[in-house]
Amino acid sequence: MRTYHQLTDPDRSGLGDQIGAQRKRVAERLAAVRRIVAVMSGKGGVGKSYVTAHLARALARGGRSIGVLDADLNGPTIPGLLRDSDARRATQESSEPASGLDGVKYISMGQFLEEGSPLSFKGPTAESFVWRGAMEAAALREFLGDVEWGDLEVLLLDLPPGMQRYIELCDILGNPPTVLTVTIPTPESRDAVRRAMRAAVERGSELLGIVENMVGGELKGTAGDDLAAEFATAVVARIPSHPTPDTWNRLAAQL
């Protein structure tokens, strides 16, 4: 990955050529991936990564080849949810994803960071708001274009809150991915997720459905049904506070 000074030096960067080459590499790496699904919410605290990891495991238990890309670069949680006790730690030189629980392949910035260490890029602090986004987008391109994903039936993209990462991935992939939306029942979650779903639809993503998480507890509301009616899609799963493997198997059967 290039540094800030390499990106900003006009004689050395070749940024346009680099991005073009990476896009070509992404297309080549993902040529054997049958389906790409972005798991998103537009809101934090809804259990999106938890849903992504358990959905991936259920799909893998059903005999499918599954990969997960943890697109939450600043708050990666997928390694903690999928890491097998015997899994190796990723290295900068490796081009293979880690193999996690139930054989799910995954890649995450969390594999490269020391425990508790924040993500940081080298560059001038005073200008970080200008170049940090470009560096994060470059990291995503490398995760997709440099990792040997192999033959996958489904690649799940675990997105952070907000829409910036979704937009970056649309640009990197060339086509908008199918979207699976996660919400909790509350009106506040509904309103935040609505904005994310509307943006995804406007960008051209197919809506796979809505997962309503943390159902049946203290959280009250009808966010799942409200959003399903508004966007003419389905609530494909209602996840209770203590789901069983059958809960995830039923969700996986709908993909």
Where are these regions (language model features)?
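Extreme N-terminal, non-catalytic leader segments
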Residues: M1-K43, A87
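NTP-binding/hydrolysis catalytic cores, primarily Walker-type P-loop NTPases
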Residues: M1-T3, A229-A232, R238-L255
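Helical mechanochemical/support elements of P-loop NTPase systems and associated helical scaffolds
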Residues: R29-A32, V51, L55, L73-N74, ...
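Residue-level signature of catalytic and energy-coupling elements of molecular machines
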Residues: V33, G44, I78, I107, ...
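Walker A/P-loop phosphate-binding motif and the immediately C-terminal alpha-helix
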Residues: R35-L73, M197
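Phosphate-binding loop that captures ATP/GTP phosphates
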Residues: S65-G67, A71-L119, D225
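Switch II (G3) loop of P-loop NTPases
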Residues: G110-L169
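Conserved catalytic-core segment of NTP-binding enzymes
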Residues: D146-R238, T244
